[in-house]
Amino acid sequence: MMEVGILPVHVLYVFFIGAIILFMLLRKDTTFISLFGIFIISLWASHSLSASVSSLFHSFIYAAGELLPTIFIICFIVSMSDLLTKTGINEAMISPFASLVRGPVTAYWLIGGLMFAISLFFWPSPGVALIGAVLLPAAARAGLTPLAAAMAMNLFGHGFALSGDFVIQAAPKLTADAAGIPVGDVVSASIPLVLIMGVTTTTAAFIMIQRERKKQEHPTSFSPVLSGEQDNSLYLPKRLRSILAFLIPLAFLADIACMLLFNLQGNDATALIGGSAICILFTVHFFVYKHKGLEKITGYFIDGFKFGFKVFGPVIPIAAFFYLGDSGYESILGTSLPKGSHGIVNDLGIALSHMMPMSKELAATALTAAGAITGLDGSGFSGISLAGSIAKLFSSALHADPAILTALGQISAIWVGGGTLVPWALIPAAAICKVDPFELARKNFIPVAIGLLVTTLAAVMML
């Protein structure tokens, strides 16, 4: 039985969700409409202009506070990865695999597998440069086409690994917060869906590549583009590089073992990975700079913070709007929820279940579509909170597990916008393989569409 009716504040919230979706479809920046929505809803709820103006600042403080652990871990991972690249340790980690590239088939799966592993721990951006420098020349000699190499890097890194984000947990944090559920629930629910999506898509892409390769009498050869002259001035001695290249992955594997052993999830897991990254950064840093180490470390942190806030700058305003629909209402607006309300999104979900027949099929399709729409800006992250919010709405109406729908929306958003279908998100992989990003997006479309269809059907069966 409904405890609270649909009030003007609910109508305003739905209106601005629609406006945000429209802005995304038109590929417009969502920051203005998100903040304008917070202002108008606050003005209606508080009847105070000064409180409404203050709510804009409070919304940033609230959203940043919720996201700060995630932002920081991205900063520290990027700082560490930058130093590992400059010292040659990253190259030492994967150079042994170059000798395993025997033909185009092994090249595709080896590039994909390594890109997946690197992206889980360091995110895809460092992986593109690293594999471009070490593995792509070997793949080219083995007969892998430029487009196939770009597809492997893209689908395994920016799609398969990033859509689950099991180690860093930036994506699950955003969607879980918007859905009002623990991060661990989203991670657990996403594991089978991420595997289904990843295996289906990469296999479909491989089949397409093999068919096209058989049609080509003379496969295209290529030399990967590297970003300028390689600077070896900070390279550590070969023996030390090899030792650290062995110990650093071991440290992160130990972190994963601790997560499983002590059931660490959410911020606890984030803290363990982030702390390990800081320790590795300090250790390698003192090997490189020795007595000058204290003078150099700040620069790496600054570069990491620049990257982290560049990625999450567009995320904070839209996340603030969706926090308003759940746990952040009172903190942001400084006023209580309407009597009997369980949060704007919960109320809307209950109302939706009374207004129209709801089905698992409709809910899963809606979440896949919502996720895809949020990815149209090419980041995969800026609108991902929308998927979590809609998942909560539909799960309330269905009385179903919100984690499954949340995971489905997350997967759809990141596969589309994180860098497999939106051309401007494909530029790094396309550039290093010397292919057109629009052609890469076109080749990715069929495998990703097949994957999303199969994953949506799987989610329906899991609900």
From Swiss-Prot:
Keywords: Cell membrane, Membrane, Transmembrane, Transmembrane helix
Superkingdom of source: Bacteria
Signal peptide positions (record): none
Main location: membrane
Transmembrane stretches, start-end: 6-26, 31-51, 60-80, 101-123, 130-152, 189-209, 242-262, 269-289, 304-324, 413-433, 443-463
Protein location: Cell membrane
Membrane topology: Multi-pass membrane protein
Any one cellular-component term (Gene Ontology): plasma membrane
Name of the protein this chain belongs to: Uncharacterized membrane protein YhfA
